[in-house]
Amino acid sequence: MLDFYADWCISCKEMESYTLSNPEVKQALADFVLLQVDITKNNADDKAFLKAFNLIGPPAILFFNLNQQEQTDARVIGFQGTKTFLKHLSKL
């Protein structure tokens, strides 16, 4: 699971505070490896990273299979509440 976030991103803070910190979500993510991409600086490297994944900005969560291939249909773009995110995870 690759989580794109920025300190200035309000939706990222909401996702962290309300959704990703929820005990049910934490349990559902127990078997996932979480990597985070901090694009707070929004510099050339950050923009290149976003472009490489065809993203316009955070928040965005990407999921990969065991062969390190992105599951593009599983992308989460923008804020999702706990129930919606748990439902999404159940389909992976």
Annotate each PLM feature.
Residues 44-58:
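Structural alpha/beta surface segment adjacent to cysteine/selenocysteine redox centers
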